[in-house]
Amino acid sequence: MSGVNEIRSSFIDYFVKNGHEAVASSPLVPRNDPTLMFTNAGMVQFKNVFTGVEKRPYSRAVTAQKCVRAGGKHNDLDNVGYTARHHTFFEMLGNFSFGDYFKDRAIELAWNLITKEWDLPKDRLLATVYYDDDVAYDLWKKVAGLPDSRIIRIPTSDNFWAMGDTGPCGPCSEIFFDHGDHIPGGPPGSPDEDGDRFIEIWNLVFMQYEQLPGERLNLPRPSIDTGMGLERISALLQGTHDNYETDLMRAIIAEVQELTNVPSNGPQKASHRVIADHLRSSVFLVADGVLPSNEGRGYVLRRIMRRAMRHAQLLGAREPLMHRLVPVLVREMGRAYPEIVRAEALATETLLLEETRFRRTLERGLSLLEEESAGLVSGARFPGEVAFKLYDTYGFPLDLTEDALRGRGIEVEREAFDAAMERQKAEARANWSGSGEAATDTVWFGVREREGATEFLGYDTETAEGAVRALVQEGKEVSELPAGARGFVVLNQTPFYGESGGQVGDSGLVSGEGVKACVLNTQKKLGDVFVHDVEVTEGTLKIGTPLALEVDHARRSAVRANHSATHLLHEALRRVLGDHVAQKGSLVAPDRLRFDFSHPKPLTADELAQVEDIANTYVLRNEPVETRLMAVDDAVASGARALFGEKYGDEVRVVSMGTDSGNGAPFSVELCGGTHVKRTGDIGIVTVLADSGVAAGVRRLEALTATAARRHLNAASTALQTTAGTLKVSTAEVEARVAALVEERRKLERDLAEARKKLAMGGGGESGPAVIEVNGTRYLRIAISGADPKDLKAIVDEGKTKIGSGVVAVANTAADGKGALVVGVTADLAGKFDAQKLVRIGVEVLGGKGGGGRPDMAQGGGPDGAKADAALAAIESALGA
């Protein structure tokens, strides 16, 4: 059989030929399920279609869905690499019917594909059905001709699927392939069903019921949801029992072998497989907008990346490896998933940065491990809690801890480690809040179902008329909002923009006969329901009330300028920094804009200046900003920039601005539902304020436009003029004059420090004779006040040089009354005196605790600087003891 890419295509083509709509994979970050960390099944994007909340223009669909299982309930991470079929990333092939065909057609379509299109031998196939699903049982006999011996009734929940405690549910029917009696294992439902002989290749779910509290009802329009793992069916069709022996996985593993020079079929086979699998998860997650971090989805990605990087080290890789594998993955899967082609530069940069950091983590972890295990001897057990701390806090893998200790005959307490891990997983499950609509937003589902979408008029006007369709207060629908009340209003149509895409919602006024209300904010719920947050100032707002609607013009104009400037800055950043720049978040407000983007390091002053100059070049050209409605696929194909993880409908708005002087094409082209200026000149000016880091690999640019930028520049100019007047120079000379003053101050500080040092060395300051002998040891004691703490060690070093052999102690009393103490011991006395012990004696007199450093130089301090002389005397006594 052909390769994985051809198998994927043949599945989709088969169902398209049979009347199904080919639907693109949804992102790995779920759009519509707040409980799910990652998309882990094909039906996830259709959840609201099955429940009736969402309508699609088709009743049959086919998909190849990218999935990740590496966190929460569905977690295959620890098994990956050590079995033939576990993955963190996989593709789920599926066909779906939304109230169209049911069991008979689903079974017929499945059977014809695997036996006629793919030529699987019928005598090696068997099916399971739910124990009381006689209809499915009879259909397998009728459609497939399976004998009773190869149709197995299963009484457990394995063959009954439910979306949750309530909602659509129904029996399943699974198709199994028999690999032959030379492989251990029994058929499904038998005591040894977990063997590898009988492998499930396809699961057909018959959604025919709706589960309600206490009862189960028949659905009026039963549906079909199927799932087939592409990796598993590809292995079968390519004549192997191992998913990692398919052509796609072999290509990645071959590249790992080439780069490490370690055979992929030898003792370290598992490491090759871990790297191949985790590379796919890492690149696809980055392409869908997830970046490594210490929480949520980013933390799971970091664990996946670092597990692969650990195995790269086990293969002997001395330099970062993972980023060098991205091209082979893009070559193998980029045609099916063009998002990884667009994200190739970002994924490469992210993997390189993460692996560089991880190598430092490993070095630090080994040092900490050595410290924690210093007192253990062969046969001892290393505390599991400490191993977990190394793993959780420092990212130090357990297997590395075990490897490092095994050579010393020390074993890790796995049970304690596992217990700590379980506690963390329980906390993570309890704390996971996810994304999407919150539970308190359920009221909007009812409003959406009854009233439909809100018609948005705001692209063309800032005033309109509308009628109240729903009123909501404290999460519940109400019939009216009296004067003084605050609540949410849904209208049949509105010019008010609802907060989305980083752009803040509009505010303004609504009024009708005897009623007025301020619109404080506007939000979008469920994608197309515009919700106006209002405070009624006069009269009573009721269902059906006709209203005049007026957006705050000045505020909207400022927002428009900032949104268009954001597009110009986005493209300018790509031109200056490279194609790896991708939007990671934004805020478009009336008074400022904020743009988060992928980039591994701070921008230089020159790069910031270039970005600002490019943006302002297009502002000054005052070219038209064009908006077109296009099919989403056509828009992306034409070069419009789509944001990773963003949900787009079948038709999208494409906003283009500026003309590229090189080729005449638009400078910036993005899919965007926001409001924009008519011409780039309406932006006025773009002023970049700052570049800062917000997360690993993510930078933030802050900027102003129009009136806000003008005010900022005026304030800066005024400050410059004032400073020039104070310094009695021209504005052009301010920078040089300030630099000279700063250097002059530094010189004065150096001179002052030198003077204090000379004063201290000149005669011991307030403590009398500079050098005394204590039991044959020379002791130089110096008490000073007001010195810079940074200078104390230099004074001690000079004192050690002066006395040649002995102990030097310097006590400083600061302006706030606190005391600082530094003690030094010359090299010849290192075995006799310990500076750390001596400084602790003096620090105790100052009212402090401890003190740290080295045996030859240590420091500490305390709140009572008035006892500096007493502290020096205490050290003298210790020398004489």
UniProtKB/Swiss-Prot annotation:
The protein, known as: Alanine--tRNA ligase
Record-level GO cellular component terms: cytosol
One Pfam match: DHHA1
Top-level taxon: Bacteria
Originating organism: Azorhizobium caulinodans (strain ATCC 43989 / DSM 5975 / JCM 20966 / LMG 6465 / NBRC 14845 / NCIMB 13405 / ORS 571)
Gene: alaS
Cofactor or coenzyme needed: Zn(2+)
GO biological process: alanyl-tRNA aminoacylation; negative regulation of DNA-templated transcription
Reactions mediated catalytically: tRNA(Ala) + L-alanine + ATP = L-alanyl-tRNA(Ala) + AMP + diphosphate
Transmembrane segment boundaries: none
Lineage: Bacteria, Pseudomonadati, Pseudomonadota, Alphaproteobacteria, Hyphomicrobiales
Function: Catalyzes the attachment of alanine to tRNA(Ala) in a two-step reaction: alanine is first activated by ATP to form Ala-AMP and then transferred to the acceptor end of tRNA(Ala). Also edits incorrectly charged Ser-tRNA(Ala) and Gly-tRNA(Ala) via its editing domain.
The keyword Metal-binding is assigned to this record: yes
